[in-house]
Structure formats: C-alpha cells, structure tokens
A protein has these predicted regions:
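Conserved nucleotide-sensing/catalytic segment adjacent to the nucleotide-binding pocket
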Residues: 1-45
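Charged/polar, solvent-exposed surface patches and flexible loops
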Residues: 7-10, 14, 18, 90, ...
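Secondary-structure boundary motif
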Residues: 18-22, 94, 122
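A glycine- and Lys/Arg-enriched "phosphate-lid" helix/loop adjacent to the NTP-binding pocket
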Residues: 42-117, 124-126
C-alpha cells in the first residue's frame, strides 16, 4: 500500500477538478478510482468512487504489459505487479467500470489516441 493514499487521491482529484470543463481531454495514469484500490480505509474508498463518478464521458484503458519490467522506482516485484493487475481488473469489473484492454505497445498507444479522437468528434457532433 502506498503511504497516505488519502493525500495522493485528493491531490489527483484536485488536479482534475482544476482542468475540468477547461480542456477537451485530461489524460492520467492514476485515475481517482484507482485510489480506492490502494487503501483499506472505507471512507477513502467511498470518496474515491464518489469523486470518480462526478466525471462524465470517461474513457478508461487497461494497458496490457508487453515490455520488460523495470523495477526502478517501483514498490512491487514483477510478479506482485501482475497480481495487482488481476486485482485491479476485478475491482473495476465489480464496480461496473467500463474499460478497454489495450496492448502496451506503440500500436496500442496509437489506437488509444485514435479512439479518443473518435469520441471527441462524436461529442462535438451531438
């Protein structure tokens, strides 16, 4: 578990709130809902899930690991990180959070960009 998850999730929520309605897209590798995974405190889980629910038109992507694991700056071994992947997916499924699995490759990243652009075009047409 990361230390002080309440602070980490709160800081992320603040960053998103500052740009909400001012930009077309906000990209993060640390969505607020992920904070609910990294805590055992129910009030933090509830706050993260509630805050996440405020943001509409979300696109969520689960990046499948494809490159060599780099342990620098990590709190987990590769096997532990893979276990977390499984548990995070289970949490997202349990919460009914829609996400798309994408290969962690340049082609996968390009696909995400295209998908975001398609969704942006749909929003502007409506």
């Amino acid at each position: 578990m990361l230390n002080c998850q309440f602070y980490i999730s709160g800081k992320q929520a603040f960053r998103l709130a500052r740009v909400y309605g001012k930009v077309d897209v906000a990209v993060t590798d640390s969505p607020i809902i992920l904070g609910s995974f990294y805590t055992d405190e129910e009030y933090i889980k509830t706050a993260c899930i509630g805050e996440d629910g405020k943001y509409k038109n979300q696109l969520n992507y689960f990046i499948e690991r494809r490159k060599a694991y780099n342990p620098a700056g990590r709190n987990q071994t590769e096997d532990e990180a893979k276990e977390i992947d499984v548990k995070v997916r289970a949490m997202l499924d349990k919460l009914g959070k829609h996400y798309v699995s994408v290969e962690g490759t340049l082609e996968g990243y390009d696909w995400i960009v295209e998908d975001v652009l398609i969704h942006l075009n749909k929003l502007t047409l409506n």
